[in-house]
Amino acid sequence: MKQPAPTTRRVVVVTGASAGIGAALARVFAAHGHELVLIARRENKLDALADDIAAQGRPRPLVLAIDLSQPDAGARIKAELAAHGLEPEYIVNNAGFGLVGEATQLDHTEQLAMIDLNIRSLTELSLAFADTLARLRGGLLNVSSVAGFIPGPGMAVYYASKAYVLSFSEALHHELARRGVRVSVLCPGPVPTEFQARAGIPRVPFPRTGLPRVVGSNALTCTAEEVAEAGYEGLMRGRRVVVPGVANKAVTIITRL
């Protein structure tokens, strides 16, 4: 007797989901009825978020405590999804971190780890699941920043990594469109989250003059929840670049003139 084909469940994979924009994105996708896989290093934070989502009457997300800067991270994620009978309909690449200081003075190993997480891991997951996203007619949301539009003395490697994410994602938007995959790049301005504390913000040099300037003015700042809502809506509408906030949009337009 022929055995029935195994069934799989469609999920949204969210990296960097332990706090900030990543956690907010997870909540937004869950609120719209998507089942989730949450990935970050801090398992306790992921478990707390998963419990909270389940308490809202949604399926409890699968929690994967994985360091995405490690070379085997992509293979581990694919293996875990397969073992649980899950297929990613959407990938949200949010994991990343920044460091404040002159590039020549900061620890080189830490900066290379930043490149591994902000660039290599994002690229690996974007490409590794492209065929699945195409088959499921899903989407890819990569998180960049308004920093991706300008050079950033004082955060040189971080700004450069976000410029890569912006350029790479815009190219994928066109390459994968013919295969039915929506690709959007989310470019928030300053957001008061744990990310800023880790990076040593709020004071960084202003990119064009090198003069100190406070990051997080009321005109540019959005909440993590506002950013997440804009990212979800932009992805579902197939927008190439999503910049939350009128002031932030103005900044990005000016830099491209």
Language model features with spans:
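Conserved glycine-rich cofactor-binding loop
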Residues: 18-19
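Conserved glycine-rich Rossmann-like NAD(P)H-binding loop of the short-chain dehydrogenase/reductase
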Residues: 32-49
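Conserved NAD(P)H cofactor-binding loop of Rossmann-fold oxidoreductase domains
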Residues: 94-99
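Substrate-binding pocket helix/loop in short-chain dehydrogenase/reductase
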Residues: 102-115
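Active-site helix of classical SDR
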Residues: 126, 161
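Residue(s) in the substrate-gating loop at a strand-loop-helix junction
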Residues: 145
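SDR active-site lid
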Residues: 174-250
